[in-house]
Amino acid sequence: MWPIFWTAMRTYAPYVTFPVAFVVGAVGYHLEWFIRGTPNTPGEERGIAELREDRKLEELNGRDSTQVLSLKDKLEFTPRAVLERNRAVKS
């Protein structure tokens, strides 16, 4: 009888293994939730984008929005191209 049983188990292993694994997984899942209990949900967490937006608004509140740099001043601080880094600076 046992050789017939083991031959059938070996032949139909995928059909037997999946339901067994499913039952073991379901029992483990529910047991873990039973032991752990309901999770504590923290208060409303703000995302990184919202925090950044608030920080930027706070920075804007403290300064005069009519005083801005001219485009000529901004052009002086633009980095040189990567390919020109090793070239000698012409006087």
From Swiss-Prot:
It is a single-pass membrane protein. Its main location: membrane. GO terms for cellular component: membrane. The chain crosses the membrane at residues 12-34. InterPro entries: UPF0767. It is found in: Membrane. Keywords: Membrane, Transmembrane, Transmembrane helix. Belongs to the SMIM12 family. This is Small integral membrane protein 12. It comes from Danio rerio.
